[in-house]
Amino acid sequence: SAKVNATKTMHAQTVKYISAEIQKCSLGEANFMGTDQDCPATAAKAVTGAVNTMNDKNPYSTANKAIRSSTAFNEGYVSLSATNTTTIQVNTCTKTGCATADKMTATISTD
């Protein structure tokens, strides 16, 4: 469905965006996530910055932003959490019910 595909795309774009923004600190920039966060990048700063700067809407609930600080799997949400100072966990559910096949996960390192 279009909602499933939209959620899968958001998951991939979120991982790509966070990774690219963290890289800015490695390249000597003073800020990342626009000017929302100061370098050096930590997992917590990356989560906060992504939630503050990404405005994608949840395709299942368009009044809500899809990118959020959470560990939960709920349809249409890309949940971000700092596992430790250097690891960001990304948990996404693409379809109502969130069966195992409908869950996407990724980890991003700030190192």
Where are the regions a protein language model picked out?
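Amphipathic alpha-helical segments typified by the pilin-like N-terminal helix
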Residues: 1-13
